Amino acid sequence: MAEALASQLNKAKLGDNGAETKWKEQLKLPPKDTRTQTEDVTATKGLEFEDFYIKRELMMGIFEAGFEKPSPIQEETIPVALTGRDILARAKNGTGKTAAFVIPTLERTNPKISKTQALILVPTRELALQTSQVCKTLGKHLGINVMVTTGGTGLQDDIIRLSDTVHIIVGTPGRILDLASKGVADLSECTTFVMDEADKLLSPEFTPVIEQLLSFHPKDRQVMLFSATFPMIVKSFKDKHMRNPYEINLMDELTLRGITQYYAFVEERQKVHCLNTLFSKLQINQSIIFCNSTNRVELLAKKITELGYSCFYSHARMLQQNRNRVFHDFRNGVCRNLVCSDLLTRGIDIQAVNVVINFDFPKNAETYLHRIGRSGRFGHLGLAINLINWDDRYNLYKIEQELGTEIQPIPPSIDKKLYVYDTPETIPRPIANASTERNPPAQLAQSSDNQNHRQAHHISGGHGQQTANRGHSLRGSYRGGRAQGHRGGHPENNRTNPMSSRSNMPTSTTAS
């Protein structure tokens, strides 16, 4: 169906004359992203956004956000979604799934109708914030009101906002069900129902909530499911709640082609030393370091700070306002390194991240796939390094087999061409709010000399309070500096194997 639509659209291209394209010249476009892209996003049919016959105001938002041409998942999804048909779409992490459902949702929303017309469900609060910002940015010329609502925030604020017109609601299932059950959120005319990361949303903890939410929608709703992985429970949902869905599967392989994967065998007590060595050898723009528990997240963040590196951390037990601040500031390039639990494995799109480190190796292939997908976003290059101990050997083999991928032993030196770009200033922060940008990732890659001379300090709560006592009042962010050497992963001309050296440095992150 998508190929037939593409053929028809190619026969009737819009915007071929000067009058039609002149409006483009008035747009305020961001700097062009000149990085090489893989076939994950370049293997398209050659369609343009104009070929979808969408509103000019929407196209203005699309181009001003830095989009140039639709990716494969967008080419397949958008024309079908615009017809109102149910969709079940499977595509890799970081290939443009969010825009694939946001664009048709915005196009089909009528700003003149003062009712909620679309509901977008996501599994985590951070992903809700990110997705709502995508909606607002792409739809900024449409006059559409977008609201984000998640648990961990005041219900009264949501009630006040819903007293005004809200066209699109983005949020987590529990909070939206609470609002709908109380009669605060009126979903009686909400004809678009979208689930991102659908495999997670249809897990046993969420499924009853999802089915209750559907009961508040009209019978003739459009249901769209998007994910990188679809377990059997998704088929059960499809058979029960979807009408002849159009199925899209772009998963000819599971892992992104631009991500190079390595493992290093290392004793548990030497992991922090190994991480320190990697920081000094790799040219990191931004990195995400994953741990398997919230306790280890905080312990590792503290240890990294004591080594002299700037570091934020985030996990599910933190206050929501602190999680939001960490996510916002890391996305805007305030800090180079983020330690987190699997809270941020789902859908989070920070294009400046070029290195992911599994400090703790994940227990299953699904988690591994989502973790390493935080680098190599939208067809770009990235590096995934796994610190493996003796007990992880079987999981390493099992994950390789399940994903059909090869995780190689880490070499004495890693070619920068695998994950570093010569012009880091071109790396965009998609959907960033220019008024809140502080220190972009491009500057991160160039400002180590200034940062090396900063005094080590811990930021408690907001960024205004600083204290030299790193060990107390931990609330989501550590900042560190070192008087000498490199900070945050700058290259040295030392080609020794990061795994070859040993240290007796004590660590607070030994396995429990």
Swiss-Prot record:
One annotated Gene Ontology cellular component of this protein: P-body
EC number from the UniProt entry: 3.6.4.13
Entry keywords, A to Z: ATP-binding, Cytoplasm, Helicase, Hydrolase, mRNA processing, mRNA transport, Nucleotide-binding, RNA-binding, Translation regulation, Transport
Bias kind Polar residues: ranges: 433-450, 494-512
Positions of the Helicase C-terminal domain: 258-418
Localization per Swiss-Prot or TrEMBL: Cytoplasm, P-body
GO biological process, one term: mRNA processing
Segments of this protein annotated with the region Disordered: 1-24, 429-512
Motif (DEAD box): 196-199
Residue ranges constituting the Helicase ATP-binding domain according to the UniProt record: 78-248
Motif (Q motif): 47-75
CDD domains: DEADc_DDX6, SF2_C_DEAD
Catalytic activity: ATP + H2O = ADP + phosphate + H(+)
Positions that bind ATP: 91-98
GO terms of molecular function: ATP binding; ATP hydrolysis activity; RNA binding; RNA helicase activity
Similarity-based family: Belongs to the DEAD box helicase family. DDX6/DHH1 subfamily.
Function: ATP-dependent RNA helicase involved in mRNA turnover, and more specifically in mRNA decapping. Is involved in G1/S DNA-damage checkpoint recovery, probably through the regulation of the translational status of a subset of mRNAs. May also have a role in translation and mRNA nuclear export.
Domain notes: The Q motif is unique to and characteristic of the DEAD box family of RNA helicases and controls ATP binding and hydrolysis.
Identification of the protein by name: ATP-dependent RNA helicase DHH1
Organism expressing this protein natively: Coccidioides immitis (strain RS)
Taxon lineage: Eukaryota, Fungi, Dikarya, Ascomycota, Pezizomycotina
Gene designation: DHH1
